[in-house]
Amino acid sequence: MSNQGAFDGAANVESGSRVFVYEVVGMRQNEETDQTNYPIRKSGSVFIRVPYNRMNQEMQRITRLGGKIVSIQTVSALQQLNGRTTIATVTDASSEIAKSEGNGKATPVKTDSGAKGFAKPPAEEQLKKKDNKGNTMTQAKAKHADVPVNLYRPNAPFIGKVISNEPLVKEGGIGIVQHIKFDLTGGNLKYIEGQSIGIIPPGVDKNGKPEKLRLYSIASTRHGDDVDDKTISLCVRQLEYKHPESGETVYGVCSTYLTHIEPGSEVKITGPVGKEMLLPDDPEANVIMLATGTGIAPMRTYLWRMFKDAERAANPEYQFKGFSWLVFGVPTTPNILYKEELEEIQQKYPDNFRLTYAISREQKNPQGGRMYIQDRVAEHADELWQLIKNEKTHTYICGLRGMEEGIDAALSAAAAKEGVTWSDYQKDLKKAGRWHVETY
């Protein structure tokens, strides 16, 4: 859907303001039509700087990728933000945006300062939230000053070595998903739970240029799978789809590279990046996790930090005492990634961890259709709503973007029973830093 009214207004600004900034929401990758167009997708708004002579073309591209333009401003109008917004400069659309693979992350884009990375939030701002009765309150958004970001950049990546590459999908499952562990010895690649790293695959793209990096959610805690501060792990699905014109099977460049990589191979790694999905420091926090497929990666890091014996021993300052609930959507039982780990935690900590599966090709929803994660959320919406109202509760959503609408609908129904408008309440949760989303 094009925003023609916004375009007409932008065209009549003062002479000399010939570069505009689009604020776009909902931008996504469409597997049927846009696999080769390098779309971007990250939670929240995307800000794209567009020359006047490319405005119409860029609008069409945004619409094709499922995006919605919510505002158009001149660059000078945004200078008041003082670096709080990440802006992608559009020259050739495909050259500035990297293809999303794996768990759907997008390459960081250039900011006005020329540095690559994610937008920096203000140090602290007073934000509205709701108490248990739905009343408006305020709280200061949490600071993340000590979070490591961009320790290694694309022009000088860290060279890691593959230690192991293990299959996660059991016999009879669908697709290829691998758990890949890298050796970080000799470097200074520090990270924390909820962040991502970039992988630069070898070779060149269709234009003969070096392949761009792809971002993947980290699947290990800050101490690594061996709890020795020497490794980092990823959970990667091989991207596979049918070309919309030829019908041929096409495989993702970076995901195929990673899922088939041999132990001992060297890999170019950048980052870490990201502050959207960080786990709260409060050991008494409640954590709701809604994940599909490889969206389990950050959830695994949270659960290991909370419950694994070696992790608890390594983190005496963080002994989780809250309540966590994972709702995990997969197509078949063999596709339940890290199944043994998850169920071991559930058995050992039944009062602190609840595990719920939505297995779409094996279970039915109340209407007789497939049981997707949004159906499970609807089934438990009243319980989830009561938990979300607790000011210590953080909610994390990672995986397929399609689940968001159903999740919102379910929670809207639950909130409406108490006279609360979910969309308004959700905005307050986001401002308070208690609603975290990474979908694709």
Swiss-Prot record:
<dbReference type="InterPro" id="IPR035442">
    <property type="entry name" value="FNR_plant_Cyanobacteria"/>
</dbReference>
<feature type="binding site">
    <location>
        <position position="217"/>
    </location>
    <ligand>
        <name>NADP(+)</name>
    </ligand>
</feature>
<keyword id="KW-0042">Antenna complex</keyword>
<feature type="binding site">
    <location>
        <position position="294"/>
    </location>
    <ligand>
        <name>FAD</name>
    </ligand>
</feature>
<dbReference type="InterPro" id="IPR039261">
    <property type="entry name" value="FNR_nucleotide-bd"/>
</dbReference>
<keyword id="KW-0793">Thylakoid</keyword>
<feature type="compositionally biased region" description="Basic and acidic residues">
    <location>
        <begin position="122"/>
        <end position="133"/>
    </location>
</feature>
<dbReference type="InterPro" id="IPR001709">
    <property type="entry name" value="Flavoprot_Pyr_Nucl_cyt_Rdtase"/>
</dbReference>
<feature type="binding site">
    <location>
        <begin position="370"/>
        <end position="374"/>
    </location>
    <ligand>
        <name>NADP(+)</name>
    </ligand>
</feature>
<keyword id="KW-0605">Phycobilisome</keyword>
<feature type="binding site">
    <location>
        <position position="237"/>
    </location>
    <ligand>
        <name>NADP(+)</name>
    </ligand>
</feature>
<feature type="region of interest" description="Disordered">
    <location>
        <begin position="98"/>
        <end position="142"/>
    </location>
</feature>
<dbReference type="GO" id="GO:0030089">
    <property type="term" value="C:phycobilisome"/>
</dbReference>
<dbReference type="GO" id="GO:0004324">
    <property type="term" value="F:ferredoxin-NADP+ reductase activity"/>
</dbReference>
<feature type="domain" description="CpcD-like">
    <location>
        <begin position="17"/>
        <end position="75"/>
    </location>
</feature>
<dbReference type="InterPro" id="IPR015701">
    <property type="entry name" value="FNR"/>
</dbReference>
<feature type="binding site">
    <location>
        <position position="438"/>
    </location>
    <ligand>
        <name>NADP(+)</name>
    </ligand>
</feature>
<keyword id="KW-0285">Flavoprotein</keyword>
<protein>
    <recommendedName>
        <fullName>Ferredoxin--NADP reductase</fullName>
        <ecNumber>1.18.1.2</ecNumber>
    </recommendedName>
</protein>
<keyword id="KW-0560">Oxidoreductase</keyword>
<dbReference type="InterPro" id="IPR001433">
    <property type="entry name" value="OxRdtase_FAD/NAD-bd"/>
</dbReference>
<dbReference type="InterPro" id="IPR008213">
    <property type="entry name" value="CpcD-like_dom"/>
</dbReference>
<feature type="binding site">
    <location>
        <begin position="399"/>
        <end position="400"/>
    </location>
    <ligand>
        <name>NADP(+)</name>
    </ligand>
</feature>
<feature type="binding site">
    <location>
        <begin position="235"/>
        <end position="237"/>
    </location>
    <ligand>
        <name>FAD</name>
    </ligand>
</feature>
<dbReference type="InterPro" id="IPR017938">
    <property type="entry name" value="Riboflavin_synthase-like_b-brl"/>
</dbReference>
<feature type="binding site">
    <location>
        <position position="241"/>
    </location>
    <ligand>
        <name>FAD</name>
    </ligand>
</feature>
<feature type="binding site">
    <location>
        <begin position="360"/>
        <end position="361"/>
    </location>
    <ligand>
        <name>NADP(+)</name>
    </ligand>
</feature>
<dbReference type="Pfam" id="PF00175">
    <property type="entry name" value="NAD_binding_1"/>
</dbReference>
<comment type="similarity">
    <text>Belongs to the ferredoxin--NADP reductase type 1 family.</text>
</comment>
<keyword id="KW-0274">FAD</keyword>
<dbReference type="InterPro" id="IPR017927">
    <property type="entry name" value="FAD-bd_FR_type"/>
</dbReference>
<feature type="binding site">
    <location>
        <begin position="214"/>
        <end position="217"/>
    </location>
    <ligand>
        <name>FAD</name>
    </ligand>
</feature>
<keyword id="KW-0521">NADP</keyword>
<feature type="binding site">
    <location>
        <position position="294"/>
    </location>
    <ligand>
        <name>NADP(+)</name>
    </ligand>
</feature>
<keyword id="KW-0472">Membrane</keyword>
<dbReference type="Pfam" id="PF01383">
    <property type="entry name" value="CpcD"/>
</dbReference>
<feature type="binding site">
    <location>
        <begin position="253"/>
        <end position="255"/>
    </location>
    <ligand>
        <name>FAD</name>
    </ligand>
</feature>
<dbReference type="GO" id="GO:0031676">
    <property type="term" value="C:plasma membrane-derived thylakoid membrane"/>
</dbReference>
<feature type="binding site">
    <location>
        <begin position="330"/>
        <end position="331"/>
    </location>
    <ligand>
        <name>NADP(+)</name>
    </ligand>
</feature>
<feature type="domain" description="FAD-binding FR-type">
    <location>
        <begin position="155"/>
        <end position="279"/>
    </location>
</feature>
